[in-house]
Amino acid sequence: MAQRISLTRYLVEQQRVDGLIPSQLRLLLEVVARACKHISHAVNKGALGGVLGSASSENVQGEIQKKLDIIANEVLIEANEWGGHLAAMASEEMDSIYVVPNRYPQGEYLLLFDPLDGSSNIDVNVSIGTIFSVLKKPEGHPGVTTEDFLQAGSSQVAAGYCIYGPQTTLVLTVGDGVAMFTLDREQGSFVLVEENVKIPADTREFAINMSNMRHWDAPVKRYIDECLAGTEGPREKDFNMRWIASMVADVHRILTRGGIFLYPWDKREPNKPGKLRLMYEANPMSWLIEQAGGAATNGKERILDIQPKQLHERVSVILGSKNEVERVTRYHSGI
């Protein structure tokens, strides 16, 4: 029987053998994984734990918060604030950054997260997840400010997500490919199930919210029309559509078997470049996709090259199988 490799062992080997990650980053990722285990337990309890339904509050995005949104956010903060690995955190659910209190030692990393992506699906028992991104705090000044977080996605030192579905699976990159770990509840630890995840360059699956078709820009509509035309159209092959309304679930499917995910700009809010959050969702997911051989753009430029101007910046997202993403990007260029 093949030896089971735990997340801890995997990270130690990444540090010791490959020299890819410093010890403080390794310890930080282990803490994030433990927090995800706690969130997984809360999600699994559902109605039995009294965690379903909406809270009486809105987040900075103006969205009604679910009870589990708040619980997951608190779990991540409480797990990470005292370890000495972080200088500050930023969350989709908080207006401003959370600086590690003076009573705890401060580290050299910044942690960003969407504590519970796809939370509109909580009450109907569809897969949801936690997305996270790790940056290095810029040197040269004491303390930490919001500006320290405003780094392009190409500056990430680690990124991943934990999906709470039929299995709880942690997906991670530290810049050397993508690895997947499934939570063994009997053992109480994440166990490596796949290394060097690769996305096929071509696909027959696309994920987009078709109900918004009338609001799309011409390049996106052209691409989807060609997919829908099937074997009789210019693509000369049939496509299937998938849409879960949970980015974690849609991206996990793409990492597992290929596909393209589109959450484009639309005409309802022309002054907004998109809906998904650049720092909490687009950057970490785009790095994972690229590390698996895929591509990620906003239709015009690589997601990881975008220089953020604000903490809660939004962006259009097209990611997945490389040849399909490049095709949509060409259409935006008028080709």
UniProtKB/Swiss-Prot annotation:
Mg(2+) 1 binds at E92, D114, L116. Its EC number is 3.1.3.11. It is an enzyme of class 3 (hydrolase). It comes from the Bacteria. Pathway: Carbohydrate biosynthesis; gluconeogenesis. Mg(2+) 2 binds at D114, D117, E281. GO terms for biological process: fructose 1,6-bisphosphate metabolic process; fructose 6-phosphate metabolic process; fructose metabolic process; gluconeogenesis; sucrose biosynthetic process. Keywords: Carbohydrate metabolism, Cytoplasm, Hydrolase, Magnesium, Metal-binding. Its cofactor is Mg(2+). It is found in: Cytoplasm. Substrate binds at D117, G118, S119, S120, N209, K275. Binds 2 magnesium ions per subunit. Pfam families: FBPase (PF00316), FBPase_C (PF18913). It catalyses: beta-D-fructose 1,6-bisphosphate + H2O = beta-D-fructose 6-phosphate + phosphate. GO terms for molecular function: fructose 1,6-bisphosphate 1-phosphatase activity; magnesium ion binding. GO terms for cellular component: cytosol. HAMAP family: FBPase_class1 (MF_01855). Homotetramer. Belongs to the FBPase class 1 family. This is Fructose-1,6-bisphosphatase class 1. It comes from Paracidovorax citrulli (strain AAC00-1) (Acidovorax citrulli). The gene is fbp.
